[in-house]
Each structure stands twice: as C-alpha cells, then as structure tokens.
Amino acid sequence: MGATLVLVRHGQTEWSLAGRHTGRTDIELTTAGEATAKALAPALADVDFDLVLTSPRFRARRTAALAGFTEATVEDDLAEWDYGDYEGLTTPQIRESVPGWTIWDHPVPGGETPDEVGARLDRVVERVRATGGRVLVFAHGHSLRVLAARWLGLPVQDGRIFDLDTATYSVLGDDRGQPVVQRWNVGPTL
C-alpha cells in the first residue's frame, strides 16, 4: 500500500470570501473561517498521521492549530502561488486588462509561473511518497489543486479541474500502484 495524502485548505478569510488572489499576504481567518477550521478536528482526530505539514502562511498555520495540529511542520513549498502584481486582485479585475486571463494559462507579472509552482509541489509529492504512510498538509486553494494534479501525474494546468472550498479536506492515495482521488472537497459538519 502506498502513501496517503490528506489535503486541507485553510479556513475562510476576508480575501477568499471576496475572491481576491491571496499569495504572500498574511491575513487572518474570519470568524466563520475559525469555526469551520475547528469543525475539521473530528474528521481528522482519529487518523494516525506519520507527518503533518503546513504552509508558512498564517491562515494555513492557524487552520492547522484549530483543527488540532499545533505541532505541524512548516513546509515552504506549500506556500500559495505567488500572484506578483495580481496580489489582492480578483479575476474579473485582472480580466479588465487581460481578457480571458486565468492563473493556469497566462503569465503573472512579478509572480510565479505554473512550472515554478509545479516544481515546488513536486518536491512535496516526493517527500510524501518517501514516507510511505499518511501525511496531512494544510495549505491553499491553488497550491493544493496543483499538488493534487501532480500527485495524479497530471500537468500543473490540470489543477483547474479541482474545485476546492475553504476549510475542506481531500484524500489522495494509491490503488494498486495507480494514484487516485479517494475523497474530494469534504466539508466539516457544523
């Protein structure tokens, strides 16, 4: 049996609620974000994880702590996509100057390319697979979607097919050597 990777997207923030691209900006969870992060705890509490990792961003670290994982190891490679000049903007705002823009297909001035994000998350995949066990990660919408794509052997751009809400968990694993999605975008019960 291969490794199992449990992905948790951080709880809601004011910027995630507004659809603003939030990469480097370190912002707090909303009251609702704190509540849903706490509500994740029962779903994760009975699992014995071999490794627990978190993005260095406060919103991910706070979600980990509220879900009961105060000792999560910070992993810089789990940071959200660096949106460069588009930090804090919404997709409709960006499309005013770049019609049809998506993070998956267009350059991000002053930010990361899909290949750069993919390289970071490939290192996470390698680290998880090397454990051969259960690994829990707390991170962000775009970075987790890329991580899922790379786990499955798909191109970075295929991260676009994975919708991911805040304060949800997803489970990736292996079925007879084939990387698979076992659960996706499961929310806590409040």
Locations of the language-model features?
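Acidic, low-complexity terminal tails and accessory targeting/binding regions
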Residues: 1-3, 47, 82-92, 149-190
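Generic beta-sheet signal
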Residues: 5, 131-141
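Loop-to-helix element that buttresses phosphate recognition and phosphoryl-transfer chemistry
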Residues: 5-63, 109-122
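General small-molecule cofactor/ligand-binding pocket signal
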Residues: 6, 73-75, 182
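Short, well-ordered beta-to-alpha junction loops that form the rim of enzyme active sites
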Residues: 11, 55-57, 77, 121, ...
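Phosphate-coordination/substrate-recognition cap region in phosphate-metabolizing enzymes
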Residues: 39-102
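Glycine-rich phosphate-binding loop signature in dinucleotide/nucleotide-binding domains
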Residues: 45-48, 128-133
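Short glycine/proline- and acidic residue-enriched helix-loop micro-motifs
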Residues: 96-116
